[in-house]
Curated annotation (Swiss-Prot):
Pfam families: AAA_31 (PF13614). This is ParA family protein CPn_0805/CP_1066/CPj0805/CpB0834. Belongs to the ParA family. The lineage of its organism: Bacteria, Pseudomonadati, Chlamydiota, Chlamydiia, Chlamydiales.
Length: 255
């Protein structure tokens, strides 16, 4: 089982869409057994797959020791995906209940994922766009980090703080940066090379070749609670996410 944490330090980087479509492509086109984890209290991944976050338990009850992880896994209709939804309790989980007094609480996720390691080929975690307890826990549990950004100044500059955060964790726990995925890409952007250079300085050699172009069909698919592969299979977003998944699989094979 390979565990991938999908990260950003700024909202609006298509982090959740990347998580969803990487998982969907692995399941649909590569017959992989995939578990998606919504670890962001905003619960956009949960909503984007057609579930109401107010109706389901999140990993919060598992990390608090109230339920087993198998009890909170939900199969997603018409896909080969399983999901652990998010809820608002995740926002304050580390200062609640059993976790509040546990100095090693950020290592619990890694422990609980061990019980499903034979059930899935990939676990993909959608983390909050901040350097918080949830993000740290996800990175400690992960084998790989996939970083999301947009070709905008503040998004790219935020990578510097994220890089330091990841470096601190990887010094204590094995973690490989899989790559930096750029979304909302404009092939004719005047500053494309400048943004690429900034990313290269922060994460040398990690900028992925596949860029995700802006495409309204992704938002339209979310309204229906489905991946864009299901609603607009010929859209450029479908092509881009399919190619991104292929590129990442090659990297995973070679690492």
């Amino acid at each position: 089982m390979k565990t991938i944490a999908v990260n950003s330090f700024k909202g609006g980087t298509a982090k959740t869409s990347t998580t969803l479509h990487l998982g969907a492509a692995l399941a649909q086109y590569h017959q992989a057994r995939v578990l998606l984890i919504d670890f962001d209290a905003q619960a956009n991944l949960t909503s984007g797959l057609g579930l109401d976050p107010d109706c389901y338990d999140s990993l919060a009850v598992v990390l608090q020791g109230e339920k087993e992880i198998q009890e909170v896994i939900r199969p997603i209709q018409d896909t080969q995906l399983d999901l652990i939804p998010a809820d608002t309790w995740l926002e304050r989980i580390e200062v609640s209940g059993n976790l509040a007094a546990d100095r090693y609480s950020h290592e619990r996720l890694k422990y609980v994922l061990g019980s499903v390691q034979d059930k899935y080929d990939y676990v993909i975690i959608d983390t909050p766009p901040s350097l918080c307890w949830l993000t740290e826990s996800a990175l400690i549990a992960a084998d790989y980090a996939l970083i999301c950004a947009t070709p905008e100044f503040y998004s790219v500059k935020g990578l510097e703080r994220l890089a330091g955060f990841i470096q601190g964790i990887s010094a204590r726990h094995p973690l490989t940066i899989l790559g930096v995925a750029l979304s909302f890409w404009n092939c004719r952007g005047k500053n494309n090379s400048a943004f690429a250079e900034l990313i290269h300085k922060t994460f040398p050699g990690k900028l992925l070749n596949t860029k995700i172009r802006r495409d309204i069909t992704v938002s339209e698919a979310a309204i229906h609670g489905k991946p864009v592969f299901a609603t607009s299979p010929s859209a450029r977003a479908s092509e881009d996410y399919f190619n991104l998944t292929k590129e990442l699989l090659i990297l995973l094979r070679d690492i």
